[in-house]
Regions:
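A structural signal for leucine-rich repeat
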Residues: 64-67, 88-92, 162-165, 241-243, ...
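Bacterial Sec-dependent N-terminal signal peptides
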Residues: 1-24
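A short acidic, amphipathic alpha-helical/loop segment
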Residues: 60-67, 138-139, 237-241
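A short, well-structured beta->alpha microelement
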Residues: 26-39, 203-216
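Consensus positions within tandem repeat domains that build extended binding/scaffold surfaces
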Residues: 107-108, 136-139, 264, 285-288, ...
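Structural signature of tandem-repeat unit edges
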Residues: 23-31, 48-56, 71-87, 91-103, ...
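Flexible, charged surface loops at secondary-structure boundaries
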Residues: 39-47, 67-68, 164-166, 216-224, ...
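Helix-loop-beta element that forms the nucleotide-linked donor phosphate-binding surface
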Residues: 184-189
Length: 328
């Protein structure tokens, strides 16, 4: 019986690994509206990372939205978006619509189903061209996992209502272009980070060794935007996060042994949008998240939490707290 259970566990693990495997493809689209004809349904279903060059239109975006169920990363930074008019674009219910050239179409990655707007939940990162002029209405509305929108353009494109959510998506832009974006209408509340987004997972085998592990990976703490830490953390490690990681957008420390987050650890982290807390956390120190104004949505507090010290969430006006039970 034990052998059979082990075999079943192995097969389940293998199937899970296969389901999450990265499948990267690059296509040159010579004629707008023909993307889907360049691959089989099976290929479209398997792609997680897609790079497109050439010419696209609203028909192609509709297919990207509706027929690529595993799509996580889309790079259209070297593609040109052509004008299209008709009923086969992205607008809900097949409405006739005129889609302008180099505009990310309205409802590009969202759709209205039974009166409710639903975004593409698999989409995590999109890279847009320097030619982009507009990001149209509801283009990425409801894309709750779109953590990165990287725009190659040095001046901000026009952002239309509900096109992007500032509580979900960090905007990565060319060096020296922050002011051009920050003062543009509807861009004011987004987190802008200049340069390339950097994501990493660090495993820490001994207390106080986070810095060593980051250096071993050939990284600098200040450059990290999306960080997952697994293993052991102590106060020295939290001090490193506090003092030398100003550009954190997302942090997952759920699989660490930490039971206390020291005072002021994440205070004034102006780009921080999301955090996952340690499963066995007991104490959140004074002003730990003070003035993390972009931290939004629901923060899940493990049931093990017994103390939240003064001002821990001061200035986190967009944050909701939720007590959860985590099964070991």
């Amino acid at each position: 019986m034990k052998i059979r259970q082990l075999l079943i566990s192995f097969l389940l693990a293998a199937s899970t690994l296969g389901a999450t495997a990265q499948v990267s493809k690059t296509y040159y689209v010579s004629k707008p509206g023909t993307l889907i004809s360049m691959m089989t349904e099976e290929e479209a279903n398997s792609i997680t990372h897609l790079t497109l060059t050439g010419k696209l239109n609203a028909e192609d975006f509709r297919h990207l939205r509706d027929e690529f169920p595993s799509l996580k990363v889309l790079d259209i930074s070297n593609a040109e978006i052509k004008m299209y008019s008709g009923k086969a674009g992205t607008y809900p219910n097949g409405k006739f619509y005129i889609y302008m050239a180099n505009f990310i179409p309205a409802y590009a990655f969202s759709n209205v189903v039974n009166g409710v707007t639903k975004g593409k939940q698999t989409l995590e990162k999109v890279i847009l061209s320097e030619k982009i002029k507009n990001i149209e209405d509801a283009a990425f509305k409801g894309c709750d996992n779109l953590k990165i929108c990287q725009i190659r353009k040095k001046t901000a494109p026009n952002l239309l209502p509900e096109a992007l959510a500032d509580s979900v998506t960090a905007i990565f832009i060319p060096l020296g272009s922050s002011d051009a974006y920050r003062f543009k209408n509807r861009w004011e509340h987004f987190a802008f980070i200049e340069g390339e987004p950097l994501e990493t997972t660090i495993q820490v085998g001994a207390m106080g060794k986070l810095e060593d592990e980051i250096m071993k990976a050939g990284l600098q703490p200040r450059d990290i935007n999306f960080l997952t830490i697994e293993g052991k953390l102590d106060n020295a490690d939290f001090k490193l996060i506090r003092d030398y990681m100003p550009n954190l957008v997302s942090l997952d420390i759920s699989k660490t042994n930490a039971t206390t987050i020291p005072d002021f650890t994440f205070a004034q982290k102006k780009y921080l949008l999301k955090i996952k807390l340690p499963h066995n956390l007991k104490t959140i120190g004074q002003r730990v998240f003070s003035n993390c104004g972009r931290l939004a949505g629901t923060l899940e507090l493990p049931a093990s939490v017994t103390a939240i010290e003064f001002g821990a969430f001061m200035g986190c006006d967009n944050l909701r707290l939720s007590l959860i039970h985590i099964s070991e």
